[in-house]
């Protein structure tokens, strides 16, 4: 299949620039992949799609305020760093702008100078490994100096940075939010649990590759970026029990899907506690191992995320659902509306 097979025309005004005042006030397009039927609802009605004995699986990663603005003390030149992943100790892989003058040994100072970085390795495409020096606790320093790394298609300033976190965000490490989870409120999760649905958490730290366009014509030539994931023994046990009792595993978002399917693929369809790095690319023709239904936001044309949805619902039904969403003026991308596919 070709990348162009997953293209569609999206009016720019449908790209949501800010979150709605109330998280669960967003809209929900319910898609039945067996009948091909669509139903326009509001997100808080997702509870009607869940049955007692099901498991709702969410990604509890927390977005780091990973964009840092600094200067090179020797020249006064401005530098922007985007933290991608912690490689070891105080060493981080970053995306640097402008990168060409940041050679090994270059120093960068941030804020009042209580955070500094030294370039220790040069990577391709503007990537660098830097070693940070600071006083105190790194995450606290980052909270005070860093900015939220909002996606490139969002041009508005975010008034409250917590709105780019899920209410259950816990494990620091993402460069982007698992946006399907942004719609849930604590109250809605309490109602879902009270219905007899198991709430299960896993971790996948979202990398910037999530926004990277597919640059090859054939899907067979595309290589996914790697992201760190983790599923605890307690979570794995709950999911095994849900499956054994005939319940469904319902994933919130593509990051939860990719974690569960990575584990299912690794352990011959079994759900085991595991952690590691995944670069799984779920595209049409994929043989599903774990996930029975899922919620997700509306994604970019020609993205691997539209391909993932198509792998579950079929390409033509997925593109039909997107046409319906555009005609009905649904809001798209990170701060946009959601779909539930069963």
UniProtKB/Swiss-Prot annotation:
InterPro entries: QueA (IPR003699), QueA_dom1 (IPR042118), QueA_dom2 (IPR042119), QueA_sf (IPR036100). Its main location: cytoplasm. It catalyses: 7-aminomethyl-7-carbaguanosine(34) in tRNA + S-adenosyl-L-methionine = epoxyqueuosine(34) in tRNA + adenine + L-methionine + 2 H(+). GO terms for molecular function: S-adenosylmethionine:tRNA ribosyltransferase-isomerase activity. GO terms for cellular component: cytoplasm. It is an enzyme of class 2 (transferase). Its EC number is 2.4.99.17. It is found in: Cytoplasm. Pathway: tRNA modification; tRNA-queuosine biosynthesis. One of its GO terms (biological process) is queuosine biosynthetic process. Keywords: Cytoplasm, Queuosine biosynthesis, S-adenosyl-L-methionine, Transferase. Monomer. HAMAP family: QueA. Belongs to the QueA family. Transfers and isomerizes the ribose moiety from AdoMet to the 7-aminomethyl group of 7-deazaguanine (preQ1-tRNA) to give epoxyqueuosine (oQ-tRNA). PANTHER family: S-ADENOSYLMETHIONINE:TRNA RIBOSYLTRANSFERASE-ISOMERASE. This is S-adenosylmethionine:tRNA ribosyltransferase-isomerase. It comes from Streptococcus sanguinis (strain SK36). The gene is queA.
């Amino acid at each position: 299949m070709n990348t162009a097979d997953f293209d569609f025309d999206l009016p720019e005004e449908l790209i949501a620039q800010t979150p709605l005042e109330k998280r669960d006030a967003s809209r929900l397009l319910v898609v039945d992949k067996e009948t091909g039927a669509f139903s326009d609802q509001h997100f808080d009605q997702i509870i009607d799609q869940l049955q007692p004995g099901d498991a709702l699986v969410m990604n509890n990663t927390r977005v780091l305020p990973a964009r840092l603005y600094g200067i090179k003390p020797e020249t006064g030149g401005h530098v922007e760093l985007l933290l991608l992943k912690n490689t070891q100790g105080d060493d981080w892989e970053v995306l640097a702008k402008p990168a060409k003058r940041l050679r090994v040994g270059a120093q960068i100072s941030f804020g009042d100078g209580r955070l500094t970085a030294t370039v220790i390795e040069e990577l391709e495409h503007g990537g660098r490994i830097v070693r940070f020096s600071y006083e105190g606790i790194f995450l606290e320093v980052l909270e005070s100096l860093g900015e939220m790394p909002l996606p490139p298609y969002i041009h508005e300033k975010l008034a409250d940075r917590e709105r780019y976190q899920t209410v259950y965000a816990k494990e620091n490490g993402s460069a982007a939010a698992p946006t399907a989870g942004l719609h849930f409120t604590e109250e809605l999760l309490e109602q879902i649990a009270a219905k007899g649905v198991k709430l299960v958490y896993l971790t996948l730290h979202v990398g910037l590759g999530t926004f990277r366009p597919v640059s090859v014509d054939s899907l067979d030539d595309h290589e996914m970026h790697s992201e760190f994931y983790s599923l605890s023994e307690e979570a794995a046990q709950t999911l095994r029990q849900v499956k054994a009792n005939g319940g469904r595993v319902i994933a919130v978002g593509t990051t939860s899907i990719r974690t569960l399917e990575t584990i299912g693929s690794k352990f011959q369809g079994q759900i085991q506690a595991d952690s590691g790095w995944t670069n799984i690319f779920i595209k049409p023709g994929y043989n599903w191992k774990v996930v029975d239904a899922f919620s997700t936001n509306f994604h970019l044309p020609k993205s691997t995320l539209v391909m993932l949805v198509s792998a579950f619902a079929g390409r033509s039904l997925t593109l039909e659902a997107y046409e319906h969403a555009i005609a009905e003026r649904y809001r798209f991308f990170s701060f946009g509306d959601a779909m539930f596919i069963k």
